[in-house]
Amino acid sequence: MGLGKKLSVAVAASFMSLSISLPGVQAAEGHQLKENQTNFLSKNAIAQSELSAPNDKAVKQFLKKNSNIFKGDPSKRLKLVESTTDALGYKHFRYAPVVNGVPIKDSQVIVHVDKSDNVYAVNGELHNQSAAKTDNSQKVSSEKALALAFKAIGKSPDAVSNGAAKNSNKAELKAIETKDGSYRLAYDVTIRYVEPEPANWEVLVDAETGSILKQQNKVEHAAATGSGTTLKGATVPLNISYEGGKYVLRDLSKPTGTQIITYDLQNRQSRLPGTLVSSTTKTFTSSSQRAAVDAHYNLGKVYDYFYSNFKRNSYDNKGSKIVSSVHYGTQYNNAAWTGDQMIYGDGDGSFFSPLSGSLDVTAHEMTHGVTQETANLIYENQPGALNESFSDVFGYFNDTEDWDIGEDITVSQPALRSLSNPTKYNQPDNYANYRNLPNTDEGDYGGVHTNSGIPNKAAYNTITKLGVSKSQQIYYRALTTYLTPSSTFKDAKAALIQSARDLYGSTDAAKVEAAWNAVGL
C-alpha cells in the first residue's frame, strides 16, 4: 500500500510547534485549538520507524529516538490505554498523555504499526510542552466530587435511577488544560440515569476547590422536535423468545449471544427501561405494539449491519445488551442515546410520527453508542458535529434508498437532514459557511446538529466517488482507529484519507481527499 517507512506524525499544533515544512500547513501559536487545524501532519524523514518488537516498550523507544520531531521526548508522558490489532494485521497503541501521572482530559495519542513492525502514523494530542505539574493539588475526594456534581445538576442520587442498567456514575481525576496553557486537576464526573428523565451528565469539578468548571447533559438526539402518526403497519419477521408462558421481544438469535431487548414505557418518563413487550402468541399485532415492533426489527438489522460488515459485537464490541424503550413520555418529540440504551418518543403528530419507525434514525442512535466506545468524540463544536455526522453517515449506510435522514418519521417536512443537499434543511455544505454558535445548550453546543452538514456533504462526495462498500469500511476504520475525542474536521479528513490508503491504496485515498477539498477543507 505504499506505506514503507513513511511516518505521518500527528500532533496538536496548538500544544507544540513543529519545524516541519509542509505545503499548506502551518503550526498554530499559543494553546488555543483552531477549528480548522489538523493534528495529522506528514513527515517523511525520521530517525527510525522499525520497532524492535510490537509492544509498548518498543513504541516508547521509537518516540524517544524521534524526539527531534516531537520537540522533546514524549515517551515519559504517555500512559498506555490499550493496544489492538485490526483485520489488516496492523497494530494500534492508544496512549493517554499525562501531567505528573494524571491523564489529560479528552486527549489521546495513537501510534500505528504495520505488519512489518514499522510505525507508519502517529496522531493525537501530545501536549509535549506541558508543565511537569498541575497548578493545583488534589484536596477533594472522588466521593465528594460526585456529591458536588449531583448538587450542580440539581438532583439527589436517591431521586434518579438507571433502571435495569448498571450504575455507571463515576468521578475520574484528570488534568484540564486552561486557556493560558497551564493544567489543573479536576474530576471528570459522569452521571447517567433514565428516570425521571434521560440524562448523561458530564460535570467537571475542580479537585482543589470543589468549584464546578463545566456541566453538560450529553444525551445525544437524532432530532429536537417530532410528530406522531400511526406506524406503517407492514408485516416484518421478528426474533423473539418464550419466557414465563409468553412470547417477548428479546432477540437471542445473534451468533455472539448478544441480546436485543425492547421495552414499553407506556408513556411514562420514569422506571426505565419499562415493561418487556410481550404477547400470548408469536404475533405482535396490537396498535400499542407497533412502535416496539419497528424498534426491535430495525435494531436487529442495525446490529446485523455492524456485525456482518465489521464483526462488531454490539455498540461496545463486548456483546453488551442492546436495549430500547418505546412510548417514552407523552408526545415526546425525540429519539436519543442515553449512554446506556435508546429511547423513542411517539411524537406530537405535527412534526414526527413515532421515531422508532425509521431505520436510519435507529442506526444513527446506535452509532452514537459505537462512537462513545471508540473515538468518544466530545459533544461540542467540531468534534460534536463529527459525532452527529458519523451517526448520519452510518444511518445512510444502513438505509441507502435515498440520501435523507429521518424521512420515514417526519410529517411537516420531507426529512430531518440530507447528505446530498444539507442546505435543504438549513445546514452549511461548505466550510466557508461554518457557523460559530455558542457552546451552550441554546447554541446546540457549538452547532453540532448544524455544522454536521459540512462533513455530511464530504461523505456524500466520498460515497459517490467510491461507492458504499468501500466508503463504509473507510468511515468505520477512521472512527475506530484514528479519531480521538478532540478531532476536528481537518483531523477527520486526514483520518479518512489514511484509512482509504490503508485499505485500498493511494488512488482511492486521493478521491477521499478530493471529496473533502470540495467542501472547503
Swiss-Prot record:
Which domain of life, per UniProt? Bacteria
- Which cofactors must be present for this protein to function? Ca(2+); Zn(2+)
Pfam families, alphabetized: FTP, PepSY, Peptidase_M4, Peptidase_M4_C
Active-site residue numbers: E365, H449
Q: Say if the entry is tagged with keyword Lipid biosynthesis.
A: no
Q: Which UniProt keywords are given for this protein, alphabetically ordered?
A: Calcium, Hydrolase, Metal-binding, Metalloprotease, Protease, Secreted, Signal, Zinc, Zymogen
Q: How does activity depend on temperature?
A: Thermolabile.
User: Where is Ca(2+) 2 annotated to bind?
Assistant: D399, D402, E407
Asked if the keyword Calcium belongs to this entry, the reply reads yes
Q: Which residues are assigned to the propeptide feature?
A: 28-221
Q: Which reaction does it catalyse?
A: Similar, but not identical, to that of thermolysin
Listed GO CC annotations: extracellular region
Matching Gene3D superfamilies: 3.10.170.10, 3.10.450.40, 3.10.450.490, Neutral Protease Domain 2
The places in or outside the cell where this protein is found are:
Secreted
Sequence intervals crossing the membrane: none
Q: Which InterPro entries match?
A: FTP_domain, PepSY, Peptidase_M4, Peptidase_M4/M1_CTD_sf, Peptidase_M4_C_domain, Peptidase_M4_domain, Zinc_Metalloprotease_M4
User: What is this enzyme's EC?
Assistant: 3.4.24.28
Name-wise, this protein is Bacillolysin
Task: List the source organism.
Answer: Bacillus subtilis subsp. amylosacchariticus
| Phylogenetic placement of the source organism | Bacteria, Bacillati, Bacillota, Bacilli, Bacillales
* Gene encoding the protein: nprE
